[in-house]
Amino acid sequence: MTIQLSVNVNKIAVLRNSRGGTDPDVLQAARTCIAAGAHGITVHPRPDQRHIRAGDVLALSALTREHAVEFNIEGNPFAPPRAGYPGLLELCRATRPEQITLVPDGDGQLTSDHGFDFAQDTTQLAELIAAFKAVGSRVSLFVDAGNPDIAGAAALGADRVELYTGPYAHAHASGQTDTALALFADAGRRASAAGLGINAGHDLSQANLGDFLAAVPGVLEVSIGHALISEALYQGLEATVRAYVDILRGSQVGA
């Protein structure tokens, strides 16, 4: 089975919002990604609306349903609603995405940079996971590869984990990948042993994706945004998505 590519279109919205108006068109960019072979679209609507907004979520939900590809909504389940942001649970109830990825990021974070700590009180998180699953979506939790209790995600009711791959990307850029890959491979094995599906994302790129997938068993899906959109500035969006799909086809699940 081919590992799935979900393209994160947040950066398209960042560019649009920097100028105001509707260009570049997030919906058209997503359409291009799907036509080029992307298996899904990811968004991370934040309470400060710095990129993806509630209206984008609704429109992209309709688009992905029309094209029969998966919609993945990321977000902090603890962030309260505020003006323009109805809250993650309400957005998911309105759109019923195939997957909801819960991320423990604060309002002031530039980007997601750590996973959940299952050593903390997780009663509220378990209740929220149950609420998100009641929407009809599978639930994935953002985790660090070094988390000693990745199996705790299964105990909380999650279906998958998304391995935070930022540390791997940094190690790859410095040419020091062996230790990082061993850590992620171990995390993948522990997740699989707990019955969890494995996703991966953050700073994955054409340069480092193949090595990661060759070393980490059982990855089902990668979510890629920043690097893909950056590369598309030089290579074109359609060609860039196709290049990622080619990498994934060469890295079959279970291969």
UniProtKB/Swiss-Prot annotation:
Binding site for 3-amino-2-oxopropyl phosphate: N8, R19, D203, G225, H226
Residues reported to bind 1-deoxy-D-xylulose 5-phosphate: R46, H51, T111
Alphabetical list of Pfam families matching this protein: PdxJ
Gene: pdxJ
Function summary: Catalyzes the complicated ring closure reaction between the two acyclic compounds 1-deoxy-D-xylulose-5-phosphate (DXP) and 3-amino-2-oxopropyl phosphate (1-amino-acetone-3-phosphate or AAP) to form pyridoxine 5'-phosphate (PNP) and inorganic phosphate.
Keyword annotations from UniProtKB, A to Z: Cytoplasm, Pyridoxine biosynthesis, Transferase
Domain of life of the source: Bacteria
Residues the UniProt record annotates as site (Transition state stabilizer): E162
Protein name in the entry: Pyridoxine 5'-phosphate synthase
Annotated compartments: Cytoplasm
Principal place of residence: cytoplasm
E.C. number: 2.6.99.2
Top class in the EC scheme: transferase
Originating organism: Xanthomonas oryzae pv. oryzae (strain MAFF 311018)
Family: Belongs to the PNP synthase family.
Summary of subunit composition and partner proteins: Homooctamer; tetramer of dimers.
Pathway(s) per entry: Cofactor biosynthesis; pyridoxine 5'-phosphate biosynthesis; pyridoxine 5'-phosphate from D-erythrose 4-phosphate: step 5/5
Record GO biological process: pyridoxine biosynthetic process
A GO molecular function held by the record: pyridoxine 5'-phosphate synthase activity
Gene3D superfamilies assigned to the protein according to its UniProt record, in alphabetical order: Aldolase class I (3.20.20.70)
